[in-house]
Amino acid sequence: ANKEMDNVVLSIDGRKEVHDNMRPFRKGAGSYDLIVPKFQKFAESRNQDKYYVRGTYTHFNTDFSKDVLHLADLGFKQISVEPVVAQPTDAYALKEEDLPVLFDEYDKLAAEMVKRNRQGNGFNFFHFMIDLEGGPCVYKRLSGCGSGTEYLAVTPWGDLYPCHQFVGNE
């Protein structure tokens, strides 16, 4: 699979209780214990490059910096944790009153990343990888995202979509 897929995104939401709450199997059991060793093996097979573990934070885990750091503590070096896209009526949807906490979490995460980097135990956090002088590459400026060209979402059932936000749209 490494020669066919240049970059792979592995879905894991962070701490066991957070992940298992949002990504259980059909019968209700959590998936964390099954996927973590497989994801670790995959990341190592790529020498910690050309992959991301990608999680989603929700109203239920506004302390998401703990999830990012948990993933780093598991040995992952390429990490992305993003805000949930949800209907405002969904219990897990982020709310306006969550914003001060979320802003603080990004500050905590940045400080911890600097500390770990100085200790030789750094990791990449996708949303902090910004070219402050040139902005996004020309391709990103023109297209906005990689949906359908450099990004593909695969559901647990094997269905393919150009982006995770399109899953279920037929």
Question: What function would you assign to each model-found segment?
Answer:
Residues 1-17, 48:
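Conserved SAM/AdoMet-binding glycine-rich loop
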Residues 6-9, 35-39:
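A conserved non-catalytic segment of reverse transcriptases
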Residues 17, 21-33, 40, 44-157, ...:
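Radical SAM enzyme [4Fe-4S]-AdoMet core and its adjacent flexible, acidic
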